[in-house]
């Protein structure tokens, strides 16, 4: 995630204030002059908000609470998946517990456009309601299908809350205040990401059960509800426009096509070879529909008869800028590696080392903490000293070394070694995982900054969704094959249930002799996941070297704060 204080003043004949909010970037008029070249300037000294003192502190705290919940929900299921499978079964849907939430966050591109058109307060509150409703459905879910639907809804609302927080902070603070307030969001996001697996593991191991990993969002949301309604300022970017006029400013058709295509791609990657054979009619049909929707999306970006060019979801001419595309690929790869690691490192410790859910969650701390710290150090140093290629080459190289070492992990590898490998991956990816959000702002004109950052955000989400889906499919297919060979007398269904987690009934029912046969095969199956991450890190290294010749300047002229 990235937060930038760059702003732009735009005069409008109708006297409306223009707000561009895309994913994690919002632009508003302010009064501190910053020269970007080409005559574009920004300004900002006076605080633009009407609330101050305890009211503003309370409102800001409420915004941070939504960031905490969103970050917590992003990683909380990493350690409660085995308990969920124990209750519901359907191992083939295991990856959807995480993928469903990540898929819902794909709405962040649409929410960014919506916040730039409609009243921020009510869009924000609507997203809080969506998130809480999704959490309630997850907690009360009677089956796996209901849980996955709840996760998708929570992801949709959570991405809207996150986008809303950044929009509000950008609208309600000037350029001097903005870095400090956004740094607060950085810290809270890091805390939530670290606590997620630990909190989830604690609930899974207690009498409260895994359901409270989702219910916990409800009392926190209820406690801050009065603040949302009474203290959050009402801010309408286009007060003189009618609802119909506002609706025409959003590219709804292409948004639906994009989301449908993302869903089809995720389904085929998750279910291919797990639920349906790779050569089945269902898988072939899903790939076909995905391709058709992709073509339709690109065509409408170029030739949309109902939406003005500046209001389309993605500027097609960005594909003509190699460095900008490089930044999008880098955030896709690094974000995918980190999120998938938070799911499979605990699974390794539970299966191979016999950890409980809580203990396995704690084992993630080296990975997450070093990622957060490295990201914050990058956000502090890169805008001041530049050296952009070094951050990318150095960071991706560390990630490559870490993933290569993870590829050597087996059932006898010491915990200390795994911690060290995780530190390399965390520090490496953290060095550049969100650096591109600030860099792209030096590659485009002021009026396209929001679009550039929005494109980065959607590639970040795509990386998380697709890496979870691919990792889940790889693990399931390889583990079923290897464990099946180790236990030839056990049925395919029982083996599928067995690899759901060390707390699964099927695994617990094994004798010590059988467990001794299965555990090395599980560790071996996980090497396919580490190999996938290794390939992604290697691609990241390769893509980093062209940055040595890329013209990326002016970073020191803009205030940018990056956060994981």
Curated annotation (Swiss-Prot):
Recorded topology in the membrane: Multi-pass membrane protein
Gene name as annotated: DEP3
Basic and acidic residues bias spans: 29-38
TM annotation in the entry: 65-85, 91-111, 122-142, 152-172, 185-205, 212-232, 255-275, 281-301, 332-352, 362-382, 386-406, 423-443, 452-472, 528-548
Domain of life: Eukaryota
Annotated disulfide bonds: none
SUPFAM superfamilies: MFS general substrate transporter
Pfam families per UniProt: MFS_1
Protein name per UniProt: Efflux pump DEP3
Residue numbers spanned by region Disordered: 1-48
Organism field: Alternaria brassicicola (Dark leaf spot agent)
Any one annotated GO CC term: plasma membrane
Similarity comment: Belongs to the major facilitator superfamily. TCR/Tet family.
């Amino acid at each position: 995630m990235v937060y930038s204080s760059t702003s732009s003043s735009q005069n409008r004949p109708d006297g409306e204030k223009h707000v561009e909010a895309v994913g994690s970037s919002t632009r508003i008029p302010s009064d501190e002059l910053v020269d970007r070249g080409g005559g574009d300037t920004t300004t900002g000294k006076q605080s633009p908000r009407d609330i101050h003192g305890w009211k503003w502190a309370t409102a800001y705290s409420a915004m941070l609470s939504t960031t905490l919940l969103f970050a917590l929900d992003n990683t909380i299921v990493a350690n409660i998946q085995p308990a969920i499978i124990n209750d519901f079964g359907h191992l083939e849907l295991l990856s959807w517990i995480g993928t469903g939430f990540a898929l819902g966050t794909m709405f962040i591109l649409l929410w960014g456009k919506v916040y730039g058109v409609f009243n921020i307060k009510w869009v924000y509150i609507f997203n809080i309601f969506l998130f809480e409703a999704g959490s309630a459905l997850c907690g009360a879910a009677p089956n796996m299908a209901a849980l996955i639907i709840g996760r998708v809804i929570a992801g949709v609302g959570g991405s809207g809350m996150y986008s809303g927080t950044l929009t509000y902070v950008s609208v309600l603070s000037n350029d001097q205040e903005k870095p400090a307030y956004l740094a607060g969001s950085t810290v809270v996001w890091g805390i939530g990401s670290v606590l997620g697996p630990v909190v989830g593991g604690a609930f899974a191991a207690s009498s409260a059960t895994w359901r409270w990993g989702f219910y916990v969002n409800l009392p926190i949301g209820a406690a801050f509800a009065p603040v949302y309604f009474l203290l959050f300022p009402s801010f309408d970017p286009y007060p003189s426009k009618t609802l119909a006029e506002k609706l025409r400013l959003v590219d709804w058709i292409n948004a639906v096509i994009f989301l449908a295509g993302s869903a089809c791609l995720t389904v085929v990657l998750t279910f291919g070879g797990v639920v349906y054979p790779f050569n089945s009619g269902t898988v072939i049909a899903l790939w076909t529909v995905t391709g058709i929707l992709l073509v339709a999306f690109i065509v409408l970006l170029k030739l949309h008869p109902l939406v003005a060019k500046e209001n389309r979801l993605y500027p097609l001419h960005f594909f003509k800028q190699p460095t900008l595309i490089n930044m999008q690929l880098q955030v896709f790869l690094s974000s995918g590696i980190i999120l998938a690691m938070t799911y499979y490192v605990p699974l390794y410790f539970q299966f191979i080392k016999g950890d409980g859910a809580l203990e396995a969650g704690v084992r993630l701390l080296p990975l997450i903490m070093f990622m957060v710290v490295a990201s914050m150090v990058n956000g502090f140093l890169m805008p001041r000293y530049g050296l952009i290629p070094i951050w990318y080459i150095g960071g991706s190289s560390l990630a490559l070394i870490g993933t290569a070492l993870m590829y050597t992990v087996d059932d006898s590898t010491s915990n200390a070694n795994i911690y060290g490998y995780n530190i390399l991956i965390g520090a490496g990816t953290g060095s550049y995982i969100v650096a591109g959000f600030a860099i792209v702002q030096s590659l485009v004109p002021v009026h396209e900054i929001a679009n550039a950052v929005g494109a980065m955000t959607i590639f970040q989400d795509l990386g998380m969704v697709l890496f979870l889906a691919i990792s889940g499919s790889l693990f399931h297919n390889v583990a079923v094959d290897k464990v099946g060979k180790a236990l030839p007398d056990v049925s395919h269904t029982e083996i599928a249930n067995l690899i759901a987690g060390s707390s699964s009934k099927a695994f617990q029912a094994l004798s010590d002799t059988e467990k001794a046969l299965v555990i090395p095969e599980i560790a071996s199956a996980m090497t396919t996941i580490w190999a996938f991450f290794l390939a992604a890190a290697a691609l990241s290294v390769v893509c980093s070297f062209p940055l040595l010749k890329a013209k990326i300047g002016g970073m020191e002229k803009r205030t940018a704060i990056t956060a994981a």
